[in-house]
UniProtKB/Swiss-Prot annotation:
It comes from the Bacteria. Residues 390-397 are annotated as: G1. This is Translation initiation factor IF-2. GO terms for cellular component: cytosol. NCBIfam families: IF-2, small_GTP. Residues 415-419 are annotated as: G2.
């Protein structure tokens, strides 16, 4: 059955691919991306759904199932409501008669005012009360009472357990009173008021010991039992609790008086010269650890600590003394001052030592103003940022070259990209920003930087070469950055291209093609003749449409520095890609330690532009120095603020660098002592761009080993200067490496005068190979042995004043005079030395071949026996290869 792509269906229908994708999702079709395929039936159903709104693709039995599943939910809700009502009915029926009677009396008094009915109800009330009190425990457990009633009953039970004999006469009197007269509601209120007034008088007349409060509390409960007015009595209970608090305050006043008396005595003792003894001092010393424990106890919950924090800042955060923190670090083998920075491991160890819960936050990379766009500012659509990644020589730059219709790839030395190139391309009236990253293994940081600023990553894989190491690394960078991934299968025009094998290799590492049920687009292309490139661009636009990429055009401009260099005639320049806001010519900007004012903005074609909008790519001039690649480039209000932030950042980085030099562990001290035996190669590196400089430094530092260490004494972006020559001349065996830079005439003359060697390169392969060769020459050579021959001892001759001569038969190879020899007896090496004399009959011989007899005498060794074996060998020295 023929299948139709969703994007092609949308074009025929005259709609956008995103609209068709959303409608297909509403219908329930199994589509994952806007470029997924549809069958003829699905396409017909989607066409009908868009035109009429009728979903004919979903079968009827699914709707029935949905309705049936909804019905039991209603039934359950009804049953739950009915069960709740039944519970409420049970509660009302099981409540006690006294309360219901009480409610009916109050209602009848207010509404009707008929005293005969009230008297009957009040007469019934005391008669029912004792019956309910004498009921068994089983009945009480089954009864369901209201929460207010249970509180009153609990209070009555507690009191009656303490005072059981007083309850019986009161009950009898109640019965007699109920027979004689049933009091009205107003009379009951009046009686309770009189009793409260009398009781307050008694309380005022007897303000005695605190134990009396328990008697008063029993009295309140008795009154509440007689008056049947629980709400008012509960308030009285609260008042009595306030009396207890007054007693506590009074105790505190007495304690304060005692403390004042003690302090007066201490002042008197201090003036007494006979009291200045060690006992008082010891007491003062003992209080110090109590203070520290109190401070530590105050900290509750996890403490958020930034990753790059100084020792004194850590002590302030955890509210501990600085000396204690330094002491713990010293015990762990780290000598640190208060201004040294703590790494993640040290923070975790300190938290364990001080028994704290901490959460380590990532340190902010840039110490500049946070750019917060206005909340009310509208978010406008921006072009997608696409990064092209992949292995070396898989055709990344050739693909971009075909898209831009220019010959950039031929301009790169060795045909490999060594910088990040950023370009703008227009397709179907829409712009796309492309970032080309190098594929060489030395440029890992550049690839990760390109993946972090992008929206869509195109991984170029050669169909004839398959998945390589840098391909896997690029895929992991893109996946970690959480961006859309499109895999372009390049070099499809070659005969040995095998796309199925490539798909299988990608599926093994977790990148399954869309056709195989995965979520990744695999597009066959040929950067040489342009096959499939248009399809790739359309896929990029469809992905961008689905992502709904938007950015604010208001607020401070914010960008990322992709590459920076020092150009002659322009000074420090930086290639940036905008993230938000609009950058204009003349804006004050800051990027890491660099600051300045935007003098000019140049697009990828070298033309001047006045402003740069989000996702735009341009080269900025006017900076004070070359910023580091990956730095945040941001506009500020004026030049003063820009300079302040750049200076703060420079000071912070300097302190961090000094911290690394001062903070030394005991193990590192031992290594520094042992490094006196190490051979070092001092180097000065100058490169044309910041990214290339970082890559070269990282690659060279990996070459250091146990015998040889590379010491980079100077580095920078720009040409080789005379100051570099003088610095190189001060250190022995030093070397200047230039990458894409050339020394001028005066620099060459000074280098020749001071005997400084300068090596320049345009390909990173050649630079690394030469440094490896230099390091191999500094390393101790490898000594290998080569066996030349063997001879068996057949007879020995002892000659006075000469020594022992062994008569031998050469059984393997040849025996040479002066060569090194081992004497082997019963398979064990007895002696190692050299042959001092070799004779054939009576004549001296230089060499005796296999099958001939000869006489052999060793230097300074005469212990030779019949049956011993002479084994001759040569030592061959070879240089180590890194």
């Amino acid at each position: 059955m023929e299948k139709i792509r969703l994007s092609d269906f949308a074009k025929e229908f005259g709609k956008e691919a995103k609209f068709a994708y959303e409608k297909a999702k509403e219908m329930g079709l199994s589509v994952k991306t806007p470029s997924s395929s549809l069958t003829q039936e699905e396409a017909a159903a989607l066409f009908e759904y868009i035109n009429t709104g009728v979903n004919s693709y979903i079968p009827a039995n699914k709707t029935k199932d949905k309705k049936e599943t909804k019905k039991p939910k209603k039934a359950t809700t009804k049953t739950s409501q009915s069960a709740a009502k039944e519970k409420e009915i049970k509660k009302t029926t099981t409540t006690k008669a006294p309360k219901t009677a009480k409610k009916t009396t109050s209602e009848k008094q207010k509404d009707k005012g008929e005293q005969n009915e009230i008297e009957q109800d009040d007469a019934q009330f005391p008669a029912q009360a004792p019956q309910s009190k004498r009921a068994s425990k089983k009945v009480e457990s089954n009864d369901m009472t209201a929460p207010l009633e249970t509180k009153a009953k609990v209070g009555l039970r507690i009191v009656r357990k303490n005072d059981t004999p007083q309850e019986q006469p009161s009950m009898v009197s109640k019965k007699d009173e109920s027979k004689k007269h049933a009091p009205s509601y107003k009379e009951l209120l009046a009686d309770t008021a009189d009793e409260e007034y009398k009781r307050h008088k008694k309380d005022k007349s007897k303000p005695k010991v605190a134990t009396k409060h328990t008697d008063q509390k029993i009295h309140i409960l008795d009154d509440r039992d007689i008056s049947f007015h629980s709400d008012y009595d509960d308030e009285q209970d609260e008042i009595m609790l306030f009396d207890l608090n007054e007693r506590e305050v009074r105790d505190e006043e007495e304690e304060n008086q005692i403390r004042q008396a003690i302090t007066e005595r201490v002042h008197i003792h201090r003036k007494n010269p006979w009291m200045n003894e060690g006992s008082i001092k010891r007491g003062g010393k003992r209080r110090k650890p109590i203070k520290t424990t109190k401070n530590v106890d105050k900290i509750k919950g996890p403490i958020s600590i930034p990753e790059e924090i100084r020792v004194y800042e850590f002590a302030e955060l955890i509210k501990a003394e600085l000396k204690d923190v330094i002491k713990v670090l010293f015990n762990l083998g780290v000598m640190a001052t208060k201004n040294d920075f703590l790494d993640r491991d040290a923070i975790e160890i300190l938290s364990d030592e001080f028994e704290l819960e901490i959460s380590i936050q990532d340190a902010p990379e840039q110490n500049i103003i946070e750019s917060t766009p206005d909340i009310d500012s509208p978010l406008l659509e921006r072009p997608p940022v696409v990064t092209i990644m992949g292995h070396v020589d898989h055709g990344k730059t050739s693909l971009l070259d075909y898209i831009r219709n220019s010959r950039i790839a031929s301009g790169e030395a060795g045909g490999i990209t060594q910088h990040i190139g950023a370009y703008m391309v227009e397709k179907n009236g829409k712009k796309i920003s492309f970032i080309d990253t190098p594929g060489h293994e030395a440029f890992t940081q550049m690839r990760s930087r390109g993946a972090q600023v992008t929206d869509i990553a195109i991984i170029v894989i050669a169909a004839d070469d398959g998945v390589k190491q840098q391909t896997i690394e690029a895929l992991n960078h893109a996946k970690a950055a959480n961006v859309q991934i499109i895999i372009a299968m390049n070099k499809m025009d070659k005969e040995n291209a095998n796309p199925d094998k490539l798909k299988a290799e990608c599926a093994e590492i977790g990148f399954t093609p869309n056709e195989w049920g995965g979520e990744y687009e695999f597009i066959p292309i040929s950067a040489k003749n342009g096959d499939g490139v248009e399809n790739l661009l359309e896929t990029i636009l469809i992905q961008a449409e689905v992502l709904e990429l938007k950015a604010s055009h208001q607020g401070r401009a914010k960008a990322i520095v992709l590459e920076a260099s020092l150009e002659k005639g322009r000074g420090p320049v930086a290639t940036i890609i905008m993230q938000q806001g609009i950058l204009n010519v003349g804006d004050s900007v800051v990027a890491d330690t660099a600051f300045g004012r935007v003098r000019a903005l140049l697009d990828d074609r070298g033309q001047n532009i006045s402003q740069l909008s989000p996702s735009g790519v341009a080269v900025v001039t006017g900076l004070s120095e070359v910023p580091s690649a990956g730095a945040i480039f941001q506009s500020v209000e004026n030049d003063t603020i820009a300079r302040e932030h750049a200076q703060k950042r420079a000071l912070y980085l300097r302190q961090k660098e000094l911290s690394k030099s001062t903070k030394v562990t005991f193990d590192e001290l031992g290594e520094m002592v042992a490094q006196g035996n190490l051979k070092t190669l001092p180097l000065i590196i100058k490169a044309d761009t910041q990214g290339s400089l970082e890559a070269i430094k990282a690659s060279l530092e990996k070459l250091s080993n146990d015998e040889v260490r590379i010491n980079i004494i100077g580095f920078g972006v720009g040409g080789i200067s005379e100051s570099d020559i003088t610095l190189c001349a001060t250190s022995t065996n030093s070397l200047i490496l230039g990458f894409n830079v050339r020394p001028t005439g005066s620099v060459k003359a000074k280098a020749k005068e001071l005997g400084v060697e300068i090596k320049t390169y345009s390909i990173i392969y050649a630079l690394l190979d030469d440094i490896k060769a230099l390091l191999s020459g500094l390393m101790s050579p490898i000594v290998e042995e080569e066996n030349t021959g063997q001879a068996e001892v057949r007879e020995t001759f002892n000659i006075p004043k000469v020594g022992t001569i062994a008569g031998c038969m050469v059984v393997d190879g040849s025996i040479q005079r002066g060569i090194k020899v081992r004497l082997i007896r019963d398979g064990v090496v007895v002696h190692t030395g050299a042959i001092s004399s070799l004779k054939r009959f009576k004549d001296d011989a230089k060499e005796v071949s296999k099958g001939y007899e000869c006489g052999i005498m060793l230097e300074n060794h005469n212990d030779i026996k019949v049956g011993d074996v002479f084994e001759t060998y040569k030592e061959i020295t070879k240089t180590k290869i890194l």
